[in-house]
């Protein structure tokens, strides 16, 4: 809570400082509120002043020629439908000047974002000009344009490096995603032939409620539950498996450790989608594994144990919900453990040997050494990577999709009504909604939920992660 309150206090101070700068500034500061480059010209920063004038002029032109026409239609997202009329005189088909709802939405969001950036830029301009006034009054050195540019690649390089990726990849994608979630953009409202419009929180209500025809609420709970179970199991099974495999290979009693390590590295060299497609064929209902199991009596044994239906002549490795979930986790272990083994090998080779030797002299068993020394050290080093792996597994599209697409067919009608499956993650459900059913509105809502889950987990985990002040314990 302190960090949240501190965030809002920082915003308050930002605008307060702007008011102070404008109130206490000289005539050039106040003139900069109208002509943005005026304050820079007065302090002999000609290039900066020209840049400000160009930015201001470009913003005015953008507002008139780009923002205003689109924002005028932003409230309705268009009213003129697409129509084609055949002209018997010219024997040609003409198209009317129709509205494209998605283009209006996209252009409006971009325009609003540019306006927001300009407002922040405008405030920064006033505060900077006031700071230049104070520096001149105090006889301090005022940077030249060349010195300002150098600072962008030195002490301010982090701002230079992160600005464009943040705007282009994170902010714009998220803003469009959020906007679409409040519309009825789906297969019945596909531009340019149809228009879509705002529906408020109706899509969010659908995701958290049920009816006879709309079962998104039921499907969301089922898919979310499996997504979290999958993320936890996939992360920790490969993590622990990689550590145990690395310790086994690096053990003094293991013969030919280089050979074993090389064999597992070779499995990494094979493209993952090739491995997954081959494994899917191996475990298919008529695949080689089922053939072997049937011939040696394993299928009949599982029938007697009640693990396979009496009417089946095969083991439904990837076609039964329960079997499929177990197999997906096991196959992911096979795919993911070699990666973790390599990482764990590097960490294990850097554990201080004096700590381990001291513990053994004091009578510690191998398990105690592993649990009290090795694991804390590995968690300290790999903690951030473990968080990243968990988030990556929430969005792990390849494993689920390649193993179950065109193989697994849900028998749950409520899930089928929402185009979901028992083995779907939120991300594969989202993909199916957009790629196969063009239900962009619900896909956007699910995308927002995924983003909130990943962002919240990442922020909370990193805030509680082992901080740098404990680094000396592991040196």
Predicted features and spans:
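Alpha-helical transmembrane segments and their helix-start/interface "positive-inside/aromatic belt" motifs
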Residues: 38-54, 152-163, 261-264
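Hydrophobic, membrane-inserted alpha-helices
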Residues: 32-37
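Transmembrane helix recognition focused on a "late"/terminal membrane span
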Residues: 2-31, 47, 52-156, 176
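Glycine-centered flexibility motif
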Residues: 39, 49, 63, 136-142, ...
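A structural signal for multi-pass alpha-helical bundles of membrane permease subunits
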Residues: 70-73, 159-475
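Positively charged, hydrophobic/aromatic-enriched amphipathic segments
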Residues: 26, 44, 338-340
């Amino acid at each position: 809570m302190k960090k949240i309150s501190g965030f809002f206090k920082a915003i308050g101070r930002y605008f307060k400082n702007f008011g102070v700068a404008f109130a206490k500034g000289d005539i050039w500061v106040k003139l900069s509120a109208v002509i943005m480059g005026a304050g820079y010209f007065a302090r002999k920063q000609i290039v900066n002043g020209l840049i400000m004038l160009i930015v201001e002029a470009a913003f005015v032109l953008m507002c008139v020629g780009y923002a205003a026409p689109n924002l005028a239609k932003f409230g309705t997202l268009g009213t003129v439908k697409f129509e084609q009329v055949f002209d018997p005189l010219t024997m040609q088909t003409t198209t009317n000047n129709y509205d494209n709802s998605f283009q209006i939405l996209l252009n409006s969001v971009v325009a609003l974002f540019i306006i927001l950036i300009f407002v922040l830029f405008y405030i920064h301009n006033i505060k900077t000009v006031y700071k230049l006034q104070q520096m001149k009054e105090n006889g301090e050195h005022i940077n030249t344009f060349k010195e300002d540019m150098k600072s962008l690649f030195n002490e301010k390089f982090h701002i230079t490096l992160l600005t464009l990726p943040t705007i282009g990849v994170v902010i714009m994608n998220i803003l469009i995603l959020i906007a679409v979630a409040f519309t009825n953009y789906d297969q019945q409202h596909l531009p340019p032939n149809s228009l879509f419009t705002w529906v408020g929180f109706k899509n969010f209500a659908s995701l958290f409620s049920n009816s006879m025809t709309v079962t998104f609420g039921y499907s969301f709970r089922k898919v979310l539950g499996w997504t979290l179970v999958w993320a936890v199991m996939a992360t920790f099974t490969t993590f622990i498996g990689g550590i145990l495999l690395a310790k086994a290979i690096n053990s003094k009693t293991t013969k030919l450790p280089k050979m074993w390590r090389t064999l597992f590295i070779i499995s990494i060299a094979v493209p993952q989608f090739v491995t997954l497609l081959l494994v899917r064929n191996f475990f298919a209902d008529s695949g080689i594994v089922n053939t072997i199991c049937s011939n040696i009596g394993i299928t009949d044994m599982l029938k007697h144990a009640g693990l396979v239906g009496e009417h089946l002549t095969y083991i439904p490795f990837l076609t039964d919900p329960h079997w499929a979930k177990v197999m997906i986790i096991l196959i992911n272990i096979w795919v993911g453990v070699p990666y973790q083994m390599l990482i764990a090998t590097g960490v294990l080779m850097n554990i201080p040997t004096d700590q381990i030797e001291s513990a053994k002299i004091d009578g510690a068993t191998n398990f105690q050494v592993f649990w009290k020394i090795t694991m804390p050290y590995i968690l300290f080093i790999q903690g951030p990577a473990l968080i990243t792996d968990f988030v990556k597994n929430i969005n792990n599209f390849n494993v689920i999709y390649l193993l179950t697409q065109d193989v697994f067919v849900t028998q749950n009608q409520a899930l089928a009504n929402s185009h979901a499956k028992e083995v779907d993650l939120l991300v594969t459900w989202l993909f199916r909604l957009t790629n196969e059913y063009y239900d962009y509105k619900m896909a956007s809502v699910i995308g927002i939920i995924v983003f909130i889950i990943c962002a919240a987990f990442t922020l909370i985990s990193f805030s509680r992660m082992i901080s740098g002040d404990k680094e000396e314990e592991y040196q």
